[in-house]
């Protein structure tokens, strides 16, 4: 797969293009230019490290949306075995923007649920661009209740711009479906680990995001609204998205500092999209550690702590009047 570079990665793209050109020349000639290729590769790695060390919030949001990042089904293939996908909400339809089913993680049975985006135009439309409708959240809820019945830990993967705002979705009870999930997830008597792997967009993310631990990838985001949406409301222009991104505090480090996430999972150099295998290894370590920790907790203590976590969302302090 040819790497897609973002706007701020253009210096890296130019170096990588030069490296590819030299590889082509080397294959078609007797010249040995391997040393020059290695030099440029080191330069590219150093440049990537330098650029990614200075990313602002708006640039991080662009990385979180990168079209080549692993999606839920990719993590399922890379981390789990014996996956059996379960379909439908048993009330209206099967929403392809939410995928889920039973699987084994390190040999132990679990329930996996997550948002799913598409790669090409046809799949994006089929997956509704990762924006679930009410039936998607009701499907997720059905699987969670099934997990509780069989005492299966629940692992959710969050990556959505938000819940689908269409008229049909609203008529079928979008807000009720999200609220119902929050209500039920707060009381499920089984461990829940939520991992933000891309965009964590508003209630669409929170509807499968109430858990005992919330993990986030280094270059993922979590927010009540997209930077563009916030800018359009406050400044009447999406051009202020970069300002909105900084103000919203959507990045992993800000979220960790505010107590909204528990652990930041380090991504490979250049983001998860650059090395899926390395990302899967980091994810496996994080999930293994987190599940081992939760299994030691008594159920009542776990539920009490989970409820307090949910209640703490949106807490604030009043500043002195000026």
From Swiss-Prot:
Q: Name one GO biological process term.
A: malonyl-CoA biosynthetic process
Compartments it resides in: Cytoplasm
- Entry annotated with the keyword ATP-binding: yes
Q: What class of enzyme is it?
A: transferase
Ranges of residues in domain CoA carboxyltransferase C-terminal: 39-293
Supply the alphabetized keyword list. ATP-binding, Cytoplasm, Fatty acid biosynthesis, Fatty acid metabolism, Lipid biosynthesis, Lipid metabolism, Nucleotide-binding, Transferase
Among the GO molecular function terms of this UniProt record, one is: carboxyl- or carbamoyltransferase activity
This entry's Enzyme Commission designation comes to 2.1.3.15
Its main localization is cytoplasm
State the PROSITE patterns in the record: COA_CT_CTER
Q: Name one GO cellular component term.
A: acetyl-CoA carboxylase complex
Q: In which pathway does it act?
A: Lipid metabolism; malonyl-CoA biosynthesis; malonyl-CoA from acetyl-CoA: step 1/1
Q: Which reaction does it catalyse?
A: N(6)-carboxybiotinyl-L-lysyl-[protein] + acetyl-CoA = N(6)-biotinyl-L-lysyl-[protein] + malonyl-CoA
Q: What InterPro entries does this protein map onto?
A: Acetyl_CoA_COase_a_su, ClpP/crotonase-like_dom_sf, COA_CT_C
Q: How does it assemble?
A: Acetyl-CoA carboxylase is a heterohexamer composed of biotin carboxyl carrier protein (AccB), biotin carboxylase (AccC) and two subunits each of ACCase subunit alpha (AccA) and ACCase subunit beta (AccD).
What function is annotated for this protein? Component of the acetyl coenzyme A carboxylase (ACC) complex. First, biotin carboxylase catalyzes the carboxylation of biotin on its carrier protein (BCCP) and then the CO(2) group is transferred by the carboxyltransferase to acetyl-CoA to form malonyl-CoA.
Q: Which family does it belong to?
A: Belongs to the AccA family.
Q: What is this protein called?
A: Acetyl-coenzyme A carboxylase carboxyl transferase subunit alpha
Q: Origin organism of this chain?
A: Thiobacillus denitrificans (strain ATCC 25259 / T1)
């Amino acid at each position: 797969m040819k790497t897609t570079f973002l706007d701020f990665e253009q210096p890296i793209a130019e170096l990588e293009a030069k490296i590819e050109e030299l590889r082509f020349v080397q294959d078609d000639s007797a010249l040995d230019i391997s040393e020059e290729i290695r030099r440029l590769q080191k330069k590219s790695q150093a440049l990537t490290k330098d650029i990614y060390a200075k990313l602002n919030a708006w640039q991080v949001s662009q990385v979180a949306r990168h079209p080549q990042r692993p999606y839920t089904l990719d993590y399922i293939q890379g981390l789990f075995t014996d996956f059996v996908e379960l379909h439908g909400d048993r009330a209206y339809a099967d929403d392809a923007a939410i995928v889920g089913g039973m699987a084994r993680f390190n040999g132990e049975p679990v329930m996996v649920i997550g948002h799913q985006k598409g790669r090409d135009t046809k799949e994006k439309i089929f997956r509704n661009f990762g924006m679930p409708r009410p039936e998607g959240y009701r499907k997720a809820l059905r699987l969670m209740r099934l997990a509780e019945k069989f005492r299966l830990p629940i692992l959710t993967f969050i990556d959505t711009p938000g819940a689908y705002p269409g008229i049909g979705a609203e008529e079928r009870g979008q807000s009720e479906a999200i609220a119902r999930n929050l209500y039920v997830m707060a009381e499920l008597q089984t461990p829940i680990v939520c991992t933000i792997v891309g965009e964590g967009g508003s209630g669409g993310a929170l509807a499968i995001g109430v858990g005992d631990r919330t993990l986030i990838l280094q270059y993922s985001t979590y927010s009540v609204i997209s930077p563009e949406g916030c800018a359009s409301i406050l400044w009447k222009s999406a051009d202020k998205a970069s300002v909105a991104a900084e103000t919203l505090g959507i990045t992993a480090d800000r979220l960790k500092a505010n107590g909204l996430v528990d652990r930041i999972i380090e991504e490979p150099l250049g983001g998860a999209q650059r090395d899926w295998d390395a990302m899967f290894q980091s994810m496996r370590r994080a999930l293994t550690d987190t599940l081992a920790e939760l299994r030691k907790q008594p159920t009542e203590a776990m539920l009490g702590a989970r409820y307090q976590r949910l209640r703490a969302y949106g807490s604030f302090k009043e500043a002195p009047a000026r």
